[in-house]
């Protein structure tokens, strides 16, 4: 009980009046410029407006769209700046600046917009290898000399075939072509003989066939036995003999008696020429 009385009688020191006036002046000072940022939200609502001074009343402000009055915060601005920089670096292609440091097109645009040092246009934005120098180095590295007339776009043309090789190829081609033509001619001749087409038969063979035809003028159609006899005498094939008689009948030399007489005269003249 005694201790409580001592505490009540203890002197309490109040702050000086000047300090109180200074605190009031701080409240009446001009407030810093607030940055207005609109955040797109689906449902607009009442957003309270806050002051920097501690203990000031909170007044809700009705707005049509959500608006935040945010005071300047250097730490937050630095974080936002870093986030924007990283986003731009991921989004835009990489280029090189004067100091050979990797920057992005978005970062370059951001520096120009904010007012930082712009990228100078004296140096090209994109680095590339010069084509003539690159191919010139390749040309110098070659062990054997190359003429300029053989270079097209830095590459060498294939060497043409030499004349001697061309002559050799042409000679082989000509020889093969001659052999092929001879083989083709012989095959064609064999084909003609196989099919019994008209060819120059020996005179002795023709005289034998004409003799049989003269003896059988009225019926120039040899039987199977007669054909066998003619095959044995002439040495021809059965197909050749049949074709020869077909052609002889197509000449219409057996149409009448006069034709038969003419045939006899021709046959006699041909036999006389064969004797001579």
Swiss-Prot record:
DNA-binding positions are 194-256
Entry's Gene Ontology BP terms: regulation of DNA-templated transcription
Q: Where is this region: Disordered?
A: 176-199
Q: Name one GO cellular component term.
A: chromatin
Q: Where is the composition biased (Polar residues)?
A: 176-185
Where is this chain compositionally biased, Basic residues type? 189-199
User: What PANTHER family does its record include?
Assistant: HOMEOBOX PROTEIN TRANSCRIPTION FACTORS (PTHR11850)
Similarity remark? Belongs to the TALE/CUP9 homeobox family.
This chain belongs to the protein called Homeobox protein TOS8
Species of origin = Saccharomyces cerevisiae (strain ATCC 204508 / S288c) (Baker's yeast)
């Amino acid at each position: 009980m005694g201790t409580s009385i001592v505490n009540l009688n203890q002197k309490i020191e109040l702050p000086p009046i000047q300090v109180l006036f200074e605190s009031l002046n701080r409240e009446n000072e001009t407030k810093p410029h607030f940055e207005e940022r609109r955040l797109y939200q689906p449902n607009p609502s009442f957003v309270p407006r806050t002051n920097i001074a501690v203990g000031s009343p909170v007044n809700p402000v009705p707005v049509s769209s959500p608006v935040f009055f945010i005071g300047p915060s250097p730490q937050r601005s630095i974080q936002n700046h870093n986030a924007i920089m990283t986003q731009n670096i991921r989004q835009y292609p990489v280029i090189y600046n004067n100091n050979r440091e990797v920057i992005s097109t978005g970062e370059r645009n951001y520096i120009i917009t904010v007012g930082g040092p712009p990228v100078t246009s004296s140096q090209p934005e994109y680095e590339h290898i010069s084509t003539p120098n690159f191919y010139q180095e390749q040309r110098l590295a070659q062990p054997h000399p190359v003429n300029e007339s053989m270079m097209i776009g830095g590459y060498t043309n294939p060497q043409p075939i030499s004349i001697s090789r061309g002559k050799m190829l042409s000679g082989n081609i000509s020889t093969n072509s001659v052999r092929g033509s001879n083989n083709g001619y012989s095959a064609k001749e064999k084909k003609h003989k196989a099919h019994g087409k008209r060819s120059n038969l020996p005179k002795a063979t023709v005289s034998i066939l004409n003799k049989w035809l003269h003896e059988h003028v009225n019926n120039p159609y040899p039987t199977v036995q007669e054909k066998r006899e003619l095959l044995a005498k002439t040495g021809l094939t059965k197909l050749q003999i049949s074709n020869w008689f077909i052609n002889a009948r197509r000449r219409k030399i057996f149409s009448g008696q006069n034709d038969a007489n003419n045939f006899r005269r021709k046959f006699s003249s041909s036999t006389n020429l064969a004797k001579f």
